[in-house]
């Protein structure tokens, strides 16, 4: 029987010999490749942390020792070791296990980390609690995939280094976030990793640690505390950490020996390890970006390169910005470490001097864009809905308050699917429409998206275009209607029922409108809202229905209700959107159905509203 079949908890790991542990790493790696090929998920990141994960669970005593993973998509080996191997076939599927750590899922998942750069702060809070409870256990933050590039990580470092808490920060340095890491910190780490001392350590590290005396011997502590034991990590030492490394993150012996020694050191410790994203699977090693987050695939053949006849909204944005840059020399693009996911790869290659990947730094991205705009450039900020909320104060204080012109291209708005609650784009309409000076548009098809991006770029103010993950409905040019600020378009005239649609969800309503002889309106703008058409349709319809892929709390439906109240119109109103709860993972279709946003559910809700 294979070793992996006997691993039900970290305790089983501790019974294994070093050779068995190495074999287990190979089995876990093969299992993850086969498992993700069936479910989809984050592959390259997880292949890079298998040896580290095995070493951590072998040396430390989770959950007494606290392991916080950052970013959380690198936890597949952790899930397998902590008894969830058989559930991996349900990964990111409806009613299955999450692709991220989840406290409700396992006692070994200490902290939910879907967004990056939160682990150091959380680990420090836990370390402080352990100290107050007089515990010798450690809080350990495993920071990888570029999470150290965010300001919050440095806020945590700044605080942690000034304490005497037993916190260990492990930098899993794979030179990647989702896209390539950028910035001065990455350059600094690259210099550390390229040093001759590191090359020598890779060869002799095992010997160094094998000569160390038994656990708790003073000599070992003295040697461990020598500054710059391998390479001087001046930056981290200045923060107040005892810096160790860099070491080879794929050498299990070195990892176990190093962690075993660190285990008994007190105070803030910083271990720098070097890993390769996609390690052990050549297609992922050669193209870690492409294998970062993937769908189902054949492990023998790699990813399917077949093209769909329809464009995704991301591809629509990608094509638009490359074309727009030809005629607008002041156009520049900004993304917080999402150049591939946001569709900026082609732009970056064609216009490298006008492309800015600022790292996982959403707050900085927005205020940086403000500075560019005030200097005569027109920034286009490409950002996921779920990450946009990380820079809310910058949006309000630095941009909207000063009415600084720029365009926000908001990807992954609404139902996202398999990534679940941490990545759902449920809130952007609600948190954007309450801010003065912002125009907010919701395209429902390919042509409308292109129109709105062009309109938003040329507008002398702040515009946001929100669009979902997935393919866009196409529209013939002869059907295209002119885009006018704050004006909706009527797609179909009917009686009794008037459906006001915001975004692609309106396509679910076309057949419903025909079946029920309802009026169907593409609202196009959430802000400014077309108050005239709302007032007009409320006079000759019995029921107004709003539909959106956003939380019903403060969303577009609430905006319509405000218009009715403002104009003192009493009318039956049905608001359909995402419920007031965090949305679970599943396919987009499954999540839409669970939220009542599929055609059958929409029709049923309308029928029920009419009967009341």
State where each predicted segment sits:
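N-terminal amphipathic, basic-rich helices that act as targeting or association modules
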Residues: 1-81, 235-255, 269-272
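Long, well-ordered, tryptophan-enriched scaffold segments
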Residues: 4, 175-317
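Peripheral docking tails and interdomain loops at the edges
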Residues: 297-299, 304-307, 417-419, 438-439, ...
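Non-catalytic terminal/interface segments that mediate subunit docking, oligomerization
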Residues: 66, 275-388, 394-404, 500-503
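Structural signature of the thiamine diphosphate
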Residues: 215-283, 405-410, 429-478, 599-612
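Glycine-/acidic-rich phosphate or pyrophosphate-binding loops and their flanking alpha/beta elements
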Residues: 230, 257-260, 292-293, 312-327, ...
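Cofactor-binding active-site loop characterized by glycine-rich and histidine/acidic residues
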Residues: 42-163, 313, 331, 335-336, ...
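Generic long, charged, amphipathic alpha-helical segments
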Residues: 357, 513-537
């Amino acid at each position: 029987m294979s070793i992996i079949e006997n691993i039900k908890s970290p305790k089983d790991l501790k019974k294994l010999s070093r050779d068995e542990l190495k074999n287990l790493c190979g089995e876990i790696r093969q299992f993850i490749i086969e498992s993700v090929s069936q479910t989809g998920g984050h592959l390259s990141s997880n292949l890079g942390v298998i040896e580290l994960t095995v070493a951590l669970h072998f040396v430390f005593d989770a959950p007494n020792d606290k392991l916080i993973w950052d970013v959380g998509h690198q936890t597949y080996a952790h899930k397998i070791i902590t008894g969830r191997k058989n559930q991996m076939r349900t990964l990111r599927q409806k009613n299955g296990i999450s692709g991220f750590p989840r406290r409700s899922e396992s006692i070994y998942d200490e902290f939910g980390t879907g967004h990056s750069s939160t682990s150091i702060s959380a680990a420090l809070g836990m370390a402080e609690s352990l100290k107050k409870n007089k515990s010798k256990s450690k809080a350990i933050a495993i920071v990888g995939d570029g999470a150290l590039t965010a300001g919050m990580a440095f806020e945590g470092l700044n605080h942690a280094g000034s304490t005497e808490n037993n916190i260990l920060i492990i930098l899993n340095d794979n030179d990647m976030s989702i896209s390539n890491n950028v910035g001065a910190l990455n350059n600094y780490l690259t210099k550390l990793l390229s040093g001759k001392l590191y090359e020598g350590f890779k060869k002799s590290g095992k010997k160094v640690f094998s000569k160390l005396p038994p656990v708790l011997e003073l000599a070992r502590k003295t040697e461990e505390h020598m500054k710059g034991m391998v390479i001087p990590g001046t930056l981290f030492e200045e923060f107040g950490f005892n810096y160790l490394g860099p070491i080879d993150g794929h050498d299990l012996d070195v990892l176990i020996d190093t962690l075993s020694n660190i285990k008994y050191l007190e105070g803030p410790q910083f271990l720098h390890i070097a890993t390769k994203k996609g390690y052990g699977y050549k297609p992922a090693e050669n193209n870690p970006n492409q294998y970062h987050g993937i769908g189902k695939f054949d492990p023998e053949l790699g990813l399917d390169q077949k093209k769909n006849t329809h464009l995704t909204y991301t591809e629509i944005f990608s094509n638009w910005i490359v074309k727009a840059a030809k005629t607008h020399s002041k156009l520049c693009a900004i993304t917080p470490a999402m150049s591939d996911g946001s569709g900026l790869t082609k732009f970056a290659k064609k216009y490298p001097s006008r492309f800015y990947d600022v790292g996982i730094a959403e707050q900085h991205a927005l205020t940086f864009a403000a500075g560019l705009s005030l200097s005569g450039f027109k920034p286009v900020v490409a950002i996921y809905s779920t990450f946009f909320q990380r820079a809310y104060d910058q949006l309000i204080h630095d941009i909207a308050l000063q009415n600084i012109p720029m365009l926000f291209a908001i990807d992954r708005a609404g139902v996202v699917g398999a990534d679940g609650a941490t990545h759902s784009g449920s809130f952007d309409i609600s948190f954007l429409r309450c801010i003065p000076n912002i125009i907010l548009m919701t395209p429902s098809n390919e042509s409308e998206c292109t129109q709105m991006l062009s309109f938003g770029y040329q507008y002398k103010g702040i515009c946001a275009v929100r669009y979902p993950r997935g393919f866009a409905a196409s529209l013939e040019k002869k059907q295209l209607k002119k885009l006018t600020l704050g004006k909706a378009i009527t797609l179909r005239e009917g009686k009794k029922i008037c459906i006001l649609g915001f975004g692609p969800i309106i396509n679910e309503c076309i057949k419903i409108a025909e079946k029920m002889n309802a009026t169907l309106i593409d609202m196009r703008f959430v802000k400014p809202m077309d108050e005239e058409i709302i007032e007009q349709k409320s006079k000759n319809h019995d029921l107004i229905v709003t539909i959106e892929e956003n939380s019903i709390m403060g969303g577009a439906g609430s905006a319509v209700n405000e218009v009715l109240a403002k104009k003192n119109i009493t009318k039956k109103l049905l608001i359909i959107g995402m419920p007031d709860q965090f949305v679970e993972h599943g396919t987009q279709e499954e999540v839409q159905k669970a939220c009542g946003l599929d055609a059958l559910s929409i029709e049923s809700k309308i029928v029920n509203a009419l009967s009341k």
